[in-house]
Structure formats: structure tokens, C-alpha cells
Design a protein with these regions (language model features):
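Short, low-complexity N-terminal regulatory "tails/caps" that precede and couple sensory modules
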Residues: 1-38
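Sensory/regulatory domains in signal-transduction proteins
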Residues: 2-8, 12, 46-162
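Short alpha-helical capping/linker elements at sensor-output junctions, especially the PAS-family N-cap
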Residues: 41-45
Length: 162
């Protein structure tokens, strides 16, 4: 299967149910992590609409922008799909935590993935929360070209206001 979408950096792509983008995420995850991203009988629709885990992806821009956020991600971060896919991914962390986030992304780029990540994030409303046991991996197509990075987690904990 050859992808019809050559550049995920184009703004406005709706990848919610795109089977080729789903294959990129699922195959990259399985190659890197050694297990499936979704149950074998499920695909793009299940991952977007029904997965209990948050799944996010950003592109390879110099200032990466989210290109995918499933419904669990939208609920967790309080952004609509249209808001998410125009958002630079650095804005999912507060300014003091962006250097830590950058170190995480560099570690993923060097190793292909990391597991068991914990980090502080911020929702649209300003609600702060820790993501727990996140897996972050590179999106690499079948020809070895890096197309972005993705993350999944199913556990988070709100930070109590002082």
C-alpha cells in the first residue's frame, strides 16, 4: 500500500478515519513497541471513536502541529478536532515544562519510542494534569521516512489547585 498523502505537514487534513494514516500509526507502533495499538479486528474508526486510550500525533514541522487527536484526546485536553489540528503540540504543556517535553521528543527521535512516560500537561480550560504511563513513538512509513510522532496513554491525574 502506497500512501496517497505524501506530506502530513499540510494544514487542515482530516485524518480521523483515514485508513492509510491509521496503518502508519498502527504499523509504526507495532514495529517500535512490539504490540498492537488496537485490537486486531478494529481499525481507524474504532481508534478514533471508541478507543478508551488517548491517541495523539503531530507532524514534522519545525514547530510540530497536532495532526490527529482521537475522541478520548479531545475529551482529555478539551479541544475539538478542528481546534486540535491547528494547535502546535508544544502548547499541550505549560511554558516551564516545554524544555522537559522537548527532551522527551528528542529521546523518542533517538530511540524510536519511549514507554512509561509521565509528564504535566494543560487542557484548553487551563486544567493541569499528569499523563501517566504514556508511550511515545516515531511515525515511520514503510520506506523508513519519519512522518511525525504519536503518543498514547489511558491514565491521567488532575493536579489539585492550590
Amino acid at each position: 500500500m502506497r500512501s496517497m498523502i505524501a506530506n502530513y505537514n499540510d494544514a487542515g487534513l482530516d485524518l480521523s478515519y483515514d485508513p492509510e494514516f491509521y496503518a502508519l500509526m498502527a504499523e509504526s507502533f507495532e514495529r517500535s513497541v512490539g504490540r498492537r495499538l488496537a485490537p486486531e479486528s478494529q481499525g481507524a474508526e474504532w481508534l478514533y471513536d471508541r478507543s478508551p486510550a488517548v491517541v495523539l500525533a503531530h507532524n514534522t514541522d519545525a514547530d510540530p502541529r497536532f495532526i490527529y487527536a482521537n475522541r478520548a484526546a479531545q475529551a482529555c485536553f478539551e479541544y475539538s478536532r478542528d481546534e486540535f489540528i491547528t494547535l502546535p503540540s508544544r502548547l499541550s504543556a505549560e511554558a516551564p515544562n516545554r524544555a522537559e517535553r522537548e527532551r522527551l521528543l528528542n529521546a523518542v527521535a533517538a530511540n524510536g519510542f519511549i514507554a512509561d512516560y509521565r509528564g504535566l500537561r494543560i487542557a484548553k480550560s487551563g486544567r493541569r494534569f499528569y499523563i501517566e504511563k504514556a508511550i511515545v513513538w516515531d511515525l515511520v512509513d514503510r520506506s523508513g521516512c519519519r512522518r511525525g510522532q504519536a503518543a498514547t496513554f489511558d491514565s491521567w491525574q488532575d493536579v489539585q489547585a492550590d
